[in-house]
Structures are given as C-alpha cells and as structure tokens.
C-alpha cells in the first residue's frame, strides 16, 4: 500500500512538472501595412492542451491561432520550466522567407544560391522575450486551418534559438558567460534525405550593437573550411552540436565567453544561428556593475563644544559602476528622542574621479550645524544607494561627542594607567637608589 502511495505521489509530481508554465502564449502578428507603417493583429501559440478539443478562440484569425508541434522539444521545454511568478512573455510573429546568409564567412553553408523546393511555402518567425528567457523559433504552418472541431492552424517548429540569460549582470573585471542553445528538425523528410546523415553544418555569430551598428565579435562554422574573421576582445564560443543522430532532431550549443568585462562591453548582444537558408536570432542585454565602498572621515569621533559646529564630514564613495543612479543621504541617528532623522546642514558632492578599470569615485560633504548638549552620543551616518546594492543601501557612521559631557575615553584611561605605572616604577627606582646610597655611606664610616 505504501509503495502504491509513493508511485501515486511520483506520478502527480511528474504531472505537475509537465504541466508547469503557460499552455498558451498570446502573440502579436506584425506586418508591413503597405507603406503605412506596421500593422498588428492578435494571435496565439497553443503549446499544449488537455484532454479533448483545443479551446476555441473566435477572437483570432484561424491562421494566427497555431497549435504547435515541436519535434525537438526546445520551445515547449522552455515554457514547461517557466517560473509561475514571472511576468507574461512578450511574443511577436512575422513572415519569414528562407534565404542564404548574407555574411561572406557563412557562404559555405549554401553552395547553391537557389533555395531548395523542400523549403517552399509559408514560414513564420516567432520572437519571445521575458526577464527569464529570449527565444526565436521558425515555424512552418499548414497551408489551411483545421476546420473541425476548432478552427486552428497546425504549425511545426523547425528551428529554435534560446537563451536563459536575456539580461546578464556581470561584475566589472569578471568573465561574462552568455548561454545559448538551439534545436533543429528538418522541415520535411525530403529535406532530411537530401543531406548526408547527421546534423547539418551551421554558423554561429555573436555581435554587439553600438550606435546602431553591429560590431562582429565572433563567427564560427564548425566542420566547414574557410577563412573566418578573427575573434575580438578575447571572445570564445562553445560551438558544437550536442548529438549526431542520423536524421534529427538535433540540439546544439553556442554559449559565448568574454573575459574580464569592461564598461565599454556592456550593451545589446545579438546571437545568430545560421543553417542552410534558415536563421534564428536572440537578443541579450549585458549590464556591468561594481558595488561602491563607503567610508566616513573622521572615522571615529566628531568633537564639538556646545554651540559650535562639528568638523566637516567627508563620505568617500569609491570604485563603483555605473556612475548613474548614485544617491548620498545624511542621517542623524540616536539624537533627541532616540530616533533617526535627516541630518541638517550644508551638503554637496564632488566631481567624479575616473579610474583605470572604468570605475568611478566621488565624495559627499556635510557641514553640520552647531550642536546642542542633547545631541551628545548621536551618530552621523552617510547612507548610499546604487543600482548594484540592495534596496537598503550601504552606510558608515561616526559618533558625535559634545565637549564637557563625556568621561575619559578608553584611550585616555589606558594613557592614565600607563602614566601611573611609569610614575610608580620611577618612585620605586628612586627609593632603591636612596637606600643604596645610604648603605654606601654607612659602610665608608665604619671603614674609617
């Protein structure tokens, strides 16, 4: 009985895992509106359905209501693992026309410029983005929608390109690892049989977008001979198929490694997989950061007499990136009433100081107003907020000492003890010297 319960629990767990994530992805079909800009129409991807018929969608054009068949499983697997609390993904569909790759280094993928007849027909490019993934898929829909029992169009996934790190954040000076995977299934048996058994040749391209232009960082065509552009900035890619099944489907890896990231390397990265006449591309946004260090001067005590202003306080905020988004706040903690409040006084910030590693530093200044006796023991704090820090920020503080209201400090007590110890030793030494001299005089008198 226990084993039956265990099997039931495992089955329920597996069913939950399989059914996780959205079953339907709402999309927008985007097309050119005959010179009047872009037109958008609603569509949807039905990734899976329960028992029975697909849910009817009378609000959609049947050609844009797609029941997705994914032989390689990459598209559906990405959404089975989609976190429940994550925002809904943004999805766009558009027409796609199979063409040879335009880059010269990828010309070996398509020796014949004419697209094979096996790739004729309608194609759709689906681009999906969210905080947890960026995905591009090529779908081949059936020519006509299925009429019964629900108006819906069957579509087969041919190529999927995917990253699970669409917005990587890398600490300044550390290596960036941008993951990329892809999956391919030949669209027809004729297309598969026209090629040699095993996965087809492919091209991998990584670019960084800068001022509207793509800067090529790395290009590779594993298994093909030919002159390739040299990799830039020490970039390396793990470009290979994961398996060598004779007829597919196949999965591959195009993960990108960039060493010792600097600020100029942040921005938009475009990863493209080229197959013969087919392409898929995803976008990643790389952000570089370095959390600031904070220190306060004077470091321990700020002394002032009643009615006098304490010395100027200097908050050093050092070696951080990016330079924007920094806030410096001054607080008075433990003042009258024991509460924390915004510190009064004149405050200003210095200009940014730039360092060789791309980070910056600045200093915040506060000239407090004259103090009162009630403020003795209060603490001035410099709190900083920066995009690289938690919401609470980071702070440093110094204690305010009002003259005449405090007993001797620990340092003073230690000094007094040492002084007393030295005086005691001196007195004892003088006493021993006096006794010695007296003894010597008595000895001389007896000798005479």
UniProtKB/Swiss-Prot annotation:
Membrane-protein topology: Single-pass type I membrane protein
Residue span, Ig-like C1-type domain: 292-399
Impact after mutating residue 428 to D: Restores interaction with TAP1-TAP2
Annotated phenotype, changing residue 205 to K: Decreases cell surface expression of MR1-metabolite antigen complex
Sugar attachment sites: 253
GO MF annotation, one: TAP complex binding
Subcellular location: Endoplasmic reticulum membrane
Residue intervals on the Lumenal side: 21-414
Residue intervals on the Cytoplasmic side: 436-448
Disease field: MHC class I deficiency 3: An autosomal recessive disorder characterized by glomerulonephritis and markedly reduced cell surface expression of class I HLA antigens. Additional features are herpes zoster infection and polyps of the stomach and colon.
Protein purpose: Involved in the association of MHC class I with transporter associated with antigen processing (TAP) and in the assembly of MHC class I with peptide (peptide loading).
Name of the featured protein: Tapasin
Native species: Homo sapiens
Gene: TAPBP
């Amino acid at each position: 009985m226990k084993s039956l319960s265990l099997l039931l629990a495992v089955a329920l767990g597996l069913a939950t895992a399989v059914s996780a994530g959205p079953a339907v992805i709402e999309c927008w079909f985007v097309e050119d509106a005959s010179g009047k800009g872009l037109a958008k129409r609603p569509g949807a991807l039905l990734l899976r359905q329960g028992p029975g018929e697909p849910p009817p969608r009378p609000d959609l054009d049947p050609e844009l209501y797609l029941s997705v068949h994914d032989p390689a499983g990459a598209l559906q697997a990405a959404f089975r693992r989609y976190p429940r609390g994550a925002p809904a993904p943004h999805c766009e569909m558009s027409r796609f026309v199979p063409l040879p790759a335009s880059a010269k280094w990828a010309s070996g993928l398509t020796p014949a410029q004419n697209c094979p007849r096996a790739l004729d027909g309608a194609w759709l490019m689906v681009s999906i983005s969210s905080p947890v993934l960026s995905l591009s898929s090529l779908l081949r829909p059936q020519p006509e929608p299925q009429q019964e029992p629900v108006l819906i169009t069957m579509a087969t996934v041919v190529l999927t390109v995917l990253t699970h790190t669409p917005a990587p954040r890398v600490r300044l000076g550390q290596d960036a690892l941008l993951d990329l995977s892809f999956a391919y299934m030949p669209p027809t048996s004729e297309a598969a049989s026209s090629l040699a058994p095993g996965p087809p040749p492919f091209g991998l391209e990584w670019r960084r977008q800068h001022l509207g232009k793509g800067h090529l960082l790395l290009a590779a065509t594993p298994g093909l001979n030919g002159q390739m552009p040299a990799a830039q900035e020490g970039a390396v890619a793990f470009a290979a198929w994961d398996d060598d099944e004779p007829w597919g489907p196949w999965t591959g890896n195009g993960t990108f490694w960039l060493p010792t990231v600097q600020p100029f390397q942040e921005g938009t990265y475009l990863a493209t997989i080229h197959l013969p006449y087919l392409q898929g591309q995803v976008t990643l946004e790389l952000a570089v950061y370095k959390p600031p260090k904070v220190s306060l001067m004077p470091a321990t005590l700020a002394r002032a007499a009643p009615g006098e202003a304490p010395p100027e306080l200097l908050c050093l905020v050092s070696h951080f990136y990016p330079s924007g988004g920094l806030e410096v706040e001054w607080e008075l903690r433990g003042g009258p009433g024991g509460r924390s409040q915004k510190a009064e006084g004149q405050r200003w910030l210095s200009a940014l100081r730039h360092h060789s590693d791309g980070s910056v530093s600045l200093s915040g200044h506060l000239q407090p107003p004259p103090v009162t006796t009630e403020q003795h023991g209060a603490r001035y704090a410099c709190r900083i907020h920066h995009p690289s820090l938690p919401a609470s920020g980071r702070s440093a503080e110094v204690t305010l000492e009002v003259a005449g209201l405090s007993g001797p400090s620990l340092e003073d007590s230690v000094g007094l003890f040492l002084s007393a110890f030295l005086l005691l030793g001196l007195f004892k030494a003088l006493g021993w010297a006096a006794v010695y001299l007296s003894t010597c005089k008595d000895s001389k008198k007896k000798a005479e």
